[in-house]
Amino acid sequence: MLKLVIIENMAEIMLFSLDLLLFSTDILCFNFPSKMIKLPGFITIQIFFYPQASFGISANTILLLFHIFTFVFSHRSKSIDMIISHLSLIHILLLFTQAILVSLDFFGSQNTQDDLRYKVIVFLNKVMRGLSICTPCLLSVLQAIISPSIFSLAKLKHPSASHILGFFLFSWVLNMFIGVIFCCTLRLPPVKRGQSSVCHTALFLFAHELHPQETVFHTNDFEGCHLYRVHGPLKRLHGDYFIQTIRGYLSAFTQPACPRVSPVKRASQAILLLVSFVFTYWVDFTFSFSGGVTWINDSLLVWLQVIVANSYAAISPLMLIYADNQIFKTLQMLWFKYLSPPKLMLKFNRQCGSTKK
């Protein structure tokens, strides 16, 4: 139960920060210049983005394949597994479309907004970002029903696959409709696209993302009240406990998995990681929103925002893997069995010995 609470709280905090970030992203995209100036830091930002996208695609692929193999070999699928698999697929497509925009340098052409390729990629990127908000909303709603024996919503605790797929279909249709509106706004020339119309369209795009955020907040409040009644108030975390928690992160892949690890310690580790993400997103939101309000056409500002915005899709699979004991222990077992430095040195010595013979 505590593992599901960690996943839900992780989705709730990062959902809100990403929602604020997307609002400023829409403003900057509406006022994006027709030709992007090659600043001295542009190549540096590209160099930082490629490893980020590669790492995020690899981590989400591992998470997606693990759930696929679990379904194939066990012939059973939980609702939470379907949602996490869908979220991983969305993040893969999100990072892939953003990588195409960076690699092909669509922003460097003079007729960017008239290019069909640019519109298609921007449309897919916008749809994936909207789906990355709707999917954690469903995840939080399912995890909020934590006491089926008391509440009348017990029948919603284990929804069927048809209900989950129906929600996915509705989310895809809704976000594709929003993406069409977004691309139609980009199609207008700058003369016809005034600041008032841009703000109205940006607020409309922000409004459809506000409803999932509100749902997540209500479910989080409900779950927090229930946990308070069951477990009582949480202990206050002191400085020494924070230091021990950080050390737990560093020693996660250097020590064998212990079956008696305290769930409270794992929860506090996830909270510390979430605090760092929230701080990063709030700094980026302040930076990007100030540029969107003042209508500053700074390409370096846009590319910095792209890197920070995609950090959600790149790092969130690590949080899901760490929150899932089964995946984490499997990866840890593979590490100690095949990839740990002592094992690699032993294999190297055996190969050297066989070569000498």
Swiss-Prot record:
One of its GO terms (biological process) is response to pheromone. It is found in: Cell membrane. One of its GO terms (molecular function) is pheromone receptor activity. Changing residue 350 to C: In allele VN1R5*3. CDD domains: 7tm_V1R_pheromone. The keyword Cell membrane applies. It is a multi-pass membrane protein. Glycans are attached at residue 297. Residues 25-52, 103-130, 185-269, 322-357 are cytoplasmic. Belongs to the G-protein coupled receptor 1 family. This is Vomeronasal type-1 receptor 5. The gene is VN1R5.
